[in-house]
């Protein structure tokens, strides 16, 4: 089995026709473009699209599984064919930047795959309750994160999945996200600024490694749906909004240490250069109902990193120094999933 360092040279191929042929034989290699050439992971542990750009459009679907005689069989069929379904769309629309990720909740993993061990940090998310704010815990068995430049392709893939799960799963939540003004959240600031840079190798932060070898190449996926109080937010002067976020609004430059409050969003969520996650957040809205929000989705090789960030946001470090952004943004969901490597996905679907 060739290592990723050997196949990474394919990224340098200039001939577009050859690239398309190679893409057919090397599943998904062009959608996971942030993998470092020195990675120790081999093709056996090839990850799903966990380091991808958030994209122009996204659909997030959380399903709850029904207790039927066909549930395990139908879900396993989705697992077995997931990679092929993705490649089918990618091959037909090579410029659409299509990708999709499948994750499992803790209860679903145990029920669907009773002979499999559980990843070390896969658990039912326990709510985090601070004095002012709560990171709620909500149910979810399957997560589909679908991205593309074309919303029509997201819809096509989602409809295929929904048909395959007919009779064995019910939708808990479906949210459609969109890219806003060059990557800004609806509150007007660039989102994802704190993501690892390419030269930091985002892969090392997003993907499980040798610490849990049976699940190497997988990723812990945590999602929250935040609703923004835009009336309260828009009542703040720009300078005050900048203190809430910790960055200048119009050029995205970080405030100096002298300017930045201790409870600024980027101060509270910074838990160290070695403890990062890969975010792919997207704005969503229902303007006629006055609903505006951010769908937070974070991929991590260690969920403990994500949880530490959440504890600092909702409880504070020290206690009480909570994220001021939470005064304007309220999470109404909170669910943890595990996204296996493509190899493991095929194995559990067998």
Report each predicted region and the residues it spans.
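N-terminal mitochondrial targeting presequence
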Residues: 1-13, 18-31
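Long, histidine/aromatic-enriched segments associated with O2/redox biology
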Residues: 31, 41-350
């Amino acid at each position: 089995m060739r290592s990723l360092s050997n196949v990474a040279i394919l990224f340098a191929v200039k001939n577009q026709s050859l690239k398309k042929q190679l893409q057919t034989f090397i599943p998904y290699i062009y959608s996971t473009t942030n993998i470092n050439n020195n990675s120790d992971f081999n093709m056996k542990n090839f990850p799903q699209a966990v380091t991808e750009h958030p994209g122009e459009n996204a659909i997030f679907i959380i399903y709850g599984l029904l207790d039927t005689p066909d549930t395990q069989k139908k879900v396993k069929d989705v697992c077995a064919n997931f990679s092929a379904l993705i490649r089918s769309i990618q091959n037909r629309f090579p410029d659409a930047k299509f990708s999709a990720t499948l994750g499992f909740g803790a209860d679903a993993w145990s029920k669907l795959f009773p002979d499999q061990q559980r990843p070390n940090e896969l658990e039912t998310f326990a709510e985090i309750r601070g004095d002012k704010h709560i990171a709620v815990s909500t149910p979810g068995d399957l997560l589909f994160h679908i991205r593309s430049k074309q919303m029509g392709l997201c819809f096509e893939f989602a409809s295929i999945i929904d048909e395959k799960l007919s009779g064995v799963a019910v939708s808990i939540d479906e949210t459609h996200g969109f890219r806003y003004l060059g990557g800004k959240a609806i509150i007007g600031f660039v989102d994802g600024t704190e993501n690892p840079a390419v030269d930091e190798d985002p892969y090392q932060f997003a993907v499980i490694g040798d610490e849990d070898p049976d699940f190497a190449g997988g990723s812990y996926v945590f999602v929250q749906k935040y609703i923004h109080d835009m009336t309260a937010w828009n009542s703040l002067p720009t300078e005050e909004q900048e203190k809430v976020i910790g960055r200048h609004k119009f050029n995205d430059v970080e405030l100096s240490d002298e300017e930045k409050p201790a409870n600024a969003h980027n101060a509270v969520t910074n838990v160290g250069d070695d403890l990062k996650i890969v975010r792919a957040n997207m704005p969503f809205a229902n303007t006629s109902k006055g609903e505006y929000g951010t769908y937070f989705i974070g991929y991590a090789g260690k969920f403990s990193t994500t949880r530490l960030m959440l504890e600092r946001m909702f409880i504070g470090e020290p206690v009480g120094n909570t994220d001021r952004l939470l005064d304007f943004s309220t999470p109404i969901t909170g669910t943890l999933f595990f996204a296996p490597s493509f190899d493991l996905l095929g194995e559990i679907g067998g």
